C-alpha cells in the first residue's frame, strides 16, 4: 500500500487511459509505454479522459494494488497532456487524492546536515 515516508517515486501518467483497463493491463502499460518496472514499488496515477477519476497502481511486495477513485463533483487538477510521466511529492499526491490542486503544494527542500548534533 502507499505509506508515509515511501522513498519510491509517485508518478502521474500524463496521457489519459482507457478506464476499462484493470491491474494487468495497467501494469503492462507501465512496463511497455512508460518503460518502468511495475513490480518495483513505484506508484503510478492514471487519469480518465473526463478528469474526474483516477486509478492508482502500486506493487506492495505481496501483490498488485489498484485503487479507483471518482470525484462526486468537479475534476482533478491535471498537468498538460503529453507522453510520459510527471513526478509528485508525497504532499502533492495527498492533495491530488483529496481533489485539491496539487500544483500549489510545494515542499521546502532542505539539504541534510553534514554532521549530527
Give names to the regions the model predicted.
Residues 1-117:
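Polybasic/polar functional segments that serve as interface/processing modules
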Amino acid at each position: 500500500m502507499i505509506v508515509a515516508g515511501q522513498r519510491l517515486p509517485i508518478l502521474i501518467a500524463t496521457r489519459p487511459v482507457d478506464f476499462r483497463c484493470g491491474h494487468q493491463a495497467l501494469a503492462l502499460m507501465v512496463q511497455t509505454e512508460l518503460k518502468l518496472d511495475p513490480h518495483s514499488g513505484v506508484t503510478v496515477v492514471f487519469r480518465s479522459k473526463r478528469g474526474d477519476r483516477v486509478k492508482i497502481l502500486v506493487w506492495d511486495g505481496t501483490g498488485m494494488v489498484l485503487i479507483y477513485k471518482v470525484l462526486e463533483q468537479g475534476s482533478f487538477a491535471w498537468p498538460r497532456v503529453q507522453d510520459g510521466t510527471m513526478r509528485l511529492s508525497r504532499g502533492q499526491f495527498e492533495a491530488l487524492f483529496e481533489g485539491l490542486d496539487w500544483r500549489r503544494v510545494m515542499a521546502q527542500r532542505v539539504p541534510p546536515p553534514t554532521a549530527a548534533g
